[in-house]
A protein has these predicted regions:
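Feature captures the catalytic ectodomains and active-site-proximal regions of enzymes
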Residues: 1-160
Length: 160
């Protein structure tokens, strides 16, 4: 595809995967793989990197950590922080941006374990048609135009 890409993460495993797939990796001490990560910094760096790279992967792990720790309220609070920072980011970045939001797996906060529920996927931005879904969760997105699909199909849907 000829895209130059970068991955912003605080997680060593994701850094390794990014490197193997040809993405550059951006990490700072403030960008952790935990609930204390500096989301403002991550989104700021993502915005700066969009000016230099065609693809920016912004990895945020805090929700998974809270779920593994069986702390659903912390998971909810962290999701709200992500939502707030994403909202600020989208107000600044009004260019021909395309955005995919998803997860690599679901984690049940009650038991702290991974589960095989489908993960929600949101595609947003230039050239992507909206649908009637107004809430982003595992149940509501099943009513959207993407429906259920295998994650290996995400790339094709993103660039369709």
């Amino acid at each position: 595809m000829g895209l130059s890409g970068i991955c912003i993460t605080g997680d060593d495993t994701i850094s390794g995967i990014a490197s193997v797939t040809g993405l550059k990796v951006c990490k700072t001490k403030e960008m952790t793989a935990n609930l204390d990560t500096n989301l403002t910094e991550k989104f700021k760096v993502a915005g700066n990197m969009l000016d230099k790279h065609g693809l920016v992967v912004l990895h945020i792990k805090g929700c998974d950590i809270a779920a593994h720790n069986k702390e659903p309220v912390k998971k909810k609070d962290f999701l709200q922080k992500i939502d707030s920072e994403l909202g600020k980011f989208l107000k600044i970045r009004t260019d021909k941006l395309r955005l995919a939001i998803t997860a690599d797996h679901s984690t049940w906060s009650k038991e702290g374990t991974h589960i095989d529920d489908p993960v929600p996927v949101l595609l947003h931005g230039h050239g992507i048609k909206s649908d009637s879904v107004t809430e982003f969760d595992e149940h509501q997105v099943l009513n959207g135009k993407l429906g259920r699909f295998r994650m290996y199909q995400l790339w094709d849907k993103f660039f369709a």
